[in-house]
Amino acid sequence: MYRIILMVVRLFYKVPYYLIRIWWLGTRKNFDLEKNYAFIKKVTKAANRAGRVTIESYGVENIPKENGFIFFPNHQGMFDALVFLESCPVPFSVVYKKEVSNVILLKQVFRALHAIAIDREDIKQSLQVINQMTEEVKQGRNFLIFPEGTRSRMGNQLLPFKGGTFKSAVRAKCPIVPCALIDSYKPFDEKSIAPVTVKLIYLPPICYEEYKQLKTPEIADIVKTKIEEAIRRYSCLLYTSPS
């Protein structure tokens, strides 16, 4: 919360414009994801800089060259989306939990990206989201979904991954891109405004041919293991030139 206040204070003269512009992007009829994403990326970089947050990205070259893939990162908190929005060079949308639908700025950003809200307590609605994401990925949209289903409150430790979150990838036969977030909980969860560095590692994609014979819980375990290994490896680095 302290860092959010810092961001707002340091950008107070721009915040009204940012909010109005993002709101407008999400409501106009001629939806243009690339233009929306470019502006939101610009705002995100400004907010992170104002909040004294540095993003280090690794493995950007692992992002598939062709659209129609899904990012599967670990989930540490509300700042996670801002890490990807600054770091990722290609537009993507997000599947987010319904509970954050009314968080200021986030809801405007999600609307501008045509993100999809999922109600974890409503099985029927969850299935509809899976089906919708499947069809949109087939059409070349990129998505991000958190396979833990909720954020871990144990720092860089992961919660169990839910196999059901991988159903869209299996049905769309698309690349699965595991992503490891390190210290993404610190900017918003710690009561501090001291400079902080967050790392994001894009791991090599898992192509459909590699997982088509596996059940979704098995895929979930493989992705979780890859992310845990990346967190252990990159957490030990004092400094590595990011990609």
Where are each of the predicted segments found?
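Short glycine-rich anion-binding loops that position phosphate/pyrophosphate groups of nucleotides
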Residues: H75-G77, E148-S152
